[in-house]
C-alpha cells in the first residue's frame, strides 16, 4: 500500500500522511506484538515514527526508555527508510535534573535516546511539554547545539500554548538559533481547542502539525461505554496517564457525541474509527495524525482513513456536531 506523503512544515523532509505512535510499546503491548505493529505500519506505507524517552505510557522510572529500545531494535538495518521522531522533558530518573528543558538535561537526554534507538541522529527532536522553570534562551541554545552537532536534524514542540510557541519562534529568529519546525498537539473530534489559536499560528509560521489522539484515546472507536466504566488495559486505566485521559474525555457529553457520530458513520458506510481519522486529515493544516495500536489489526481502519476524502456535506455535519469542543483548555 502506498500512503500519500507531504512535507513536514516548510522543510524538505517528506513524511507519510499518517505517523505511527509507539507509546503502548513495552507495557500495554509486549515487544513481539510491537514488532508486528511496526511491520504492519511499514507494509501500509507509514515511514514516520514517533516515540519519547519517557514511554511506555502508564509506566514509571523503571520502564522509561523501554519503548525507544524496542523501536531501536526493530529499526536495525532499515533506519534509512524511516523518519524518526522522539521527545524529551519528561522525568526519566530520580535526580532533579532528570527532567525539564535545561541545557544539562537536553544534552544528556539526546545522547541517551540515541543509544536506546541505536542511531546516530534523530530526524525530529521535540520538547514533550513546556518547561517554564528553565529560561527559554537556555533551552533554545541547547537545542541549537544538538542540531549543530549533527545529532538532530529538526526540532519541534508538543503540548505548547500558542503564546509560548510564538515567543520561542521570535527568540530563535532574533538570536539566529535553530527554529521549531513542527508542533504535536492533541486534536480530534472531541478536542478541538487548538483551532482557536495554535493552528492559526502554525499556518502563519508554516509549521508542521503532527497531532496526537485522533481517536480520543480510543473513545472514538466506539468500544467504550460509560455504564461499564473504563476497560482494563486501555489508556483510561494505565498508570498515571489514566486520570488525565479520563479527565479529558470520560463524561456524559462525550459519550453522547460519540453515539451521534456513530450514527453519521453508519449512514456514510464507514467505521467510526476511519471517519474520525479522516476528519483530522481533512484539515489542511494537519501534516500527519499520530495513530497508535495495541494490536496490528487495529491499524486497518486507520490506514483506510488516508484514502478517504470527506465530501463537503459530511465534513460540515461532523464539524457542526462537535463545534462545542472548540472551547476549553488546550492543554487538558
Residues covered by each model-derived region:
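Active-site groove signature of glycoside hydrolases
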Residues: 114-133
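Short beta-strand segments at enzyme active-site cores
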Residues: 48-52, 84-87, 121-126, 156-157, ...
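Acidic (Asp/Glu)-rich catalytic clusters
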Residues: 10, 43, 72-80, 115-118, ...
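Structural motif corresponding to the early beta-alpha repeats
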Residues: 54-55, 77-101
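N-terminal binding-site loop/beta-alpha segment at the start of enzyme catalytic domains
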Residues: 1-82
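Active-site mouth loops of central-metabolism enzymes
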Residues: 22-32, 92-104, 130-134
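Short, acidic/polar
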Residues: 30-41, 101-117, 165-169
